[in-house]
Design a protein with these regions (language model features):
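Short, charged helix-to-loop "capping" segments that act as catalytic/coupling loops
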Residues: 2-20, 40-47, 108, 144-146
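A glycine-centered beta-loop-beta connector
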Residues: 30-33, 38-55, 96, 104-122
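The conserved cystathionine-beta-synthase
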Residues: 16-34, 40-42, 64, 82-100, ...
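Tandem CBS (Bateman) regulatory domains
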Residues: 1-13, 52-97, 119-146
Length: 146
């Protein structure tokens, strides 16, 4: 299964915020959209960074409530790992596990933002694959038993 299969089923819409958005505003965006991370982008198509709930928690623990007034650019991850639509889901799962992150932006061939995949998306697609495999094996066993 490829990343393109995930994007096709969930859509390529990505919630972004400009780098000068304050952390308080970011929290509102996360809550409103019921998401765990947001791509930081000045134009909605280039990736300047990514900010997750974990980044916010770490910043709050380190700097206190004052961080809520800071721009997201102060707490975002600037070196964003990305993937392309043609990548295999297993590669993505391995990268997410190794890097210990739960969201990865998908980029087009020219590096423009083209979607985002979460670990939940990966788990959902793997469950679907396993169910199909289980059903195929069950059918095979039933056919062999008759």
């Amino acid at each position: 299964m490829r990343i393109s299969d995930i994007i096709r089923s969930k859509g390529k819409a990505v919630v972004t915020v400009p780098p000068d958005t304050d952390v308080r505003g970011l929290l509102a965006v996360l809550a409103e959209n019921r998401i765990g991370a947001v791509v930081v982008s000045s134009d909605g198509s280039t990736i300047g960074g990514i900010v997750s709930e974990r980044d916010i928690v770490r910043a709050l623990a380190a700097r206190g409530a004052a961080v809520l007034s800071e721009p997201v650019s102060a707490i975002m991850t600037s070196e964003v790992q990305t993937c392309v639509r043609g990548a295999h889901v297993d590669e993505l799962a391995a990268a997410m596990t190794e890097g210990r992150f739960r969201h990865m932006p998908v980029v087009s061939d020219d590096g423009q933002l083209d979607g985002i995949v979460s670990i939940g998306d990966v788990v959902k697609i793997r469950i679907t694959e396993l169910e199909v495999e289980r059903d195929s094996l069950s059918s095979y066993i039933r056919a062999a038993a008759t």
